[in-house]
Amino acid sequence: MKKNRLFSAALSVLLFIGIGAPKAQAQDYYQAPPLNPEFEVLANQVVTLNLDDPEGANKAFAKLLKKIVGKKNDLFAVGDYFLKNNAYSAASQCAKKITDEMAGEDVNVYMFKGEVYMKGKQWGRAGEEYEKALYYDSTYVPAIRRNAFVYKNINPDAALDYLDKLQRIEPENFRVNKDKGDIYYKLKRRDAAIENYQAYYKSAPKDSTVLDFNSCQQYVLSLFEAQEAAKVGELSTEMLQLWPNAMVFKRMRFLADVDTYDLDAAAEHVSYIVNQEYPDSSYKYLDYFYAAKLNELNNELEPAIEYYKKALAVDSTQALAYKDLSNIYSQNQQAELGLETYKKYLEVIGDKADLSDRFFLGRRYVAVYQEPGVDPEKKQQCFDEANKIFAEVMEKKPDFIEVYIQCARLNNTDSSVANDTVKNYYLKVIEMTAETPDEYKRQRLEASKYLFFYAINVEPNDMQLARRVLDIAAGINPNDKFVQQATK
């Protein structure tokens, strides 16, 4: 007796997993046969008794099962009743009693069994049942749809094949493009995702009850990743007509404004950040990063600094924000903060740092060295460190013109005295740019001016050098004030 009660209790648990949950929505994937009124009474009794009398429910189920076993249509109809009332295990037992021999060529039975397995999240077994339906009717749309759904997470290529098949049968079904776009998006196949989302958005009614919000969001995000800023702005504006409070579309519209340098529109659309329209936790790194960019483009350095700091507070792994913040600090006469922030940038990128990163670190040291009020000892340290870094860059990339310019400027510590070290750096610039003078006019003009100064101030004067570099400067810009004064 005790054993039987334990079995009954276990059976009760199996039979009624899911009872008490909201009723499943009826689907159009299959058509069940009519339910015999006698069996409907028993099935309803099984469902209602379970809450107060599990043992009675089990007896009712056993009685019902005994009456319908071996009868395909009755097993199907009763199983459908249990499935629609979320009695998954009871529905499953009915489905299992219907053998393939009993089902024969009845695609509705295979679809029902597939839905039972779907309810139990047995995706592979569900797919097998849908395949059986397709074996008997290769164009059976419900089976194609469900297989596409089943496979989209476990075998996306198979899902795409089913969707292609469905598209050939239903070429006007815009949801097929939506589903294909979703799969390609998940696979990170951006161009294919955009192509399908574009077809979906073009064909679907512009109605928020029809269009899928997540797919529209992924469409815009894919375009943003593809750097289609103008299209991002256009679509985000349209989608805000459908979902006026959707933060993602306000964000993407604002980002597009900044990327297209539409600063007036950006100043208007940044309001969702400025006015704190959403909870703090809703704002992402890109919100603050682009707000910083907008202020930077408007030469509003202090607000830009604050937004960069907010961006990094959200995501401290974003190297670009450290680099850009370092630049802003330097522009804002905060060179020491610029140097420390640039070091943080190098720390974040780690082994990805290249020679250009080292070069710009040298420039940050130069900025601190040149900033008024810096402690003399620190000033000297920055001078030495900058020269050391520039020497390293020269050694590894001897054809990098700009590093010679920077070294010349750094070592020109007294502009009233002719300096051999500075002269040699500028001579190197003239020499290295001789074959491509038009590409380096600015650098050659700067070098020529210093070399002329050096030539007429060194003892004895080097008039040959003076004439040579004056000719170079005159060839670059005969109206330059230096050229006009030197030729008098």
Predicted regions and their residues:
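Bacterial Sec-dependent N-terminal signal peptides
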Residues: M1-A32, S208
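Residue-level marker of intrinsically disordered, low-complexity segments enriched
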Residues: L11, L15-I17, V107, T139, ...
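Alpha-solenoid helical repeat scaffolds
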Residues: Q27-E459, K488
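Alpha-solenoid helical-repeat scaffold
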Residues: V458, D462-R467, N479-F482
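Eukaryotic acidic, Ser/Thr-rich intrinsically disordered low-complexity regions
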Residues: A473-A474, N479-K488
